[in-house]
Structures are given as structure tokens and as C-alpha cells.
């Protein structure tokens, strides 16, 4: 049995001071997150435009091609692999909201089978994208600035882990469906 001693530094002098400091720090954290999110969105746009200029295809489209084998492994029918791969690319490069909006258009057009819709719903349900990574880095770095290097080093790993986690869930949906 070990006794742990925790020393808490109190920076506030009373309830009103604590509330004011908390509100101030909260606003600064929100502004930091907003600024980093805008920077990441601008970076995504830059990469997509640069890729289109260099290769004739956006980075989102290229990622869609790269995700086709994953779509197939999840159990997506062959006729829908390209469309779902594109949705996965959109989710990974942009975000899940844009991907779900695209999937909604595909559902209304009748281009996706019900099985593909079910599996893709699970595969798109995650926050593994650059915008969310920016929020994570800004939020955690604002709370523990001395660990910023460690947080940024884990960023890419967290994207991969988050993507694989939702893909595994989609695989289970594919097996059960």
C-alpha cells in the first residue's frame, strides 16, 4: 500500500475569481481550437487543389481509390465498392458529415444496395479525419502545453486507430448483415 500525495495549486482566490478564470481559459481554448480547425480545413483544401492540378484528381478521390480494397473486405458488394471507397476517402480527408451527405444522395438516387448502406453507415461513423485531429491537438495542447510534442506525435496513430476501429465495426455489420 502506497500513499500518494497530490498537490493542487489553487490559482483562484474565491468563487468569482475562479469562475472568471475558468470562463477566460475556456474562451481561449475555444478560440485556439477554432483557429487550428480553420488551418486544417485550409490545408485540406490546399492539398486537394494541388493534387488536382498535379494529377488531375483530388486527394479525396485518390484516397477513395485506396479505400476500395477495405470496402470490399468489409463485405460491400462488388458493384458498390467504388462508391463506398469514395465515401471512405471523403470521410477520411474531409469529414464524416460530408461523406454522409454524399451517401444520402446515393441512397436517394438508388445507386447503393441496402447491404452497402448498412455497412457504410458503420464505416463512416467516426471522427478519424484531419479536422478532428486538429481539434484534438488544439484542445489537449491547450490543457497540457508541456506535452504538445507527445500529442502531435500520436496524432497520425490516432487517425489510423480510429479508422481501423470503425472499419472493424463495419466488418461485423457485414458479417451479421
PLM feature spans:
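Short acidic (Asp/Glu) and glycine-rich catalytic loops that position anionic groups and cofactors
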Residues: 1-4, 44-51, 132
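Transmembrane helical segments that form the transport core of multi-pass membrane transport proteins
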Residues: 24-108
